[in-house]
């Protein structure tokens, strides 16, 4: 038996009614196959009733593992429900060879900082992918993803940060209630999962080498104060690119050096978090190393559309003769109708590129996905976990 995915969504006025409608649709799509894992996404005002949604999904799907999260917006099918109440359910039957393990990440304050526990200890090569839901109010995400890169090297980690936290509650859900974990993960093995990260940013200007810096601070680019080099680079751009820069200055850092050419997928893109005019240093949202290649980037709707379409086409090619069983999506709350001028942009693109397929996910306050084989936290991205049958 192969992998089967079912999904459902409902905008019913109560969590129980919405969960019933969504879970019934997912159950029908499974076609009698057992549910190994069910994910529940609860949105809008219904985030105050997560236990009701979980109880109903448990009754209808009887999953071996039940996890979920609250969210400010939901993705289901060809639609992005950026606002309003709703429940989305995603269910997977892993077939004869697949297995799934749900794990919890917990943090503890220690004298030198924070200790992280809960990353699975498994043999190298045993894990196909990890889906990660991260409560960043309690989880240092960058440090956590570095730990994943160390303990599960090469394993794609895909997920998101809840964009709506219930009043006086926690956003992560497991079993029949809220979880106290800082992160919830699902580790899959024995099945094939393709990750996709569309940062939607276009490189502009010349490549620049970091010649002095440490931590997240770049002091020099190409042997000169970083702020001076960036100012000169912006001045040399054409008028259209300078206009895009006004919406936010972005810097891409090459993840895997030593290639003859670097394209959009080779950079981790970050905004500039600060600058010191006296020293000429700039601060970026990622660690830097001397010798690393950097390049200015711009983000605009056309670039984001083209990049997502290109990434989807690559995944379609990578599937070969295999069938896509379903997908989980995590897209930024800075995309959607505000960025593209119309609703459902990413969901429609995913269905056009890989579908029709069962698709569920959430509009996130941060996305998680691999670049250059390492997991990173992102903003303004569309990230996807594509499950093959």
Labelled PLM ranges:
Residues 1-51, 56-59, 63-65, 69-340, ...:
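Small-residue-enriched flexible segments
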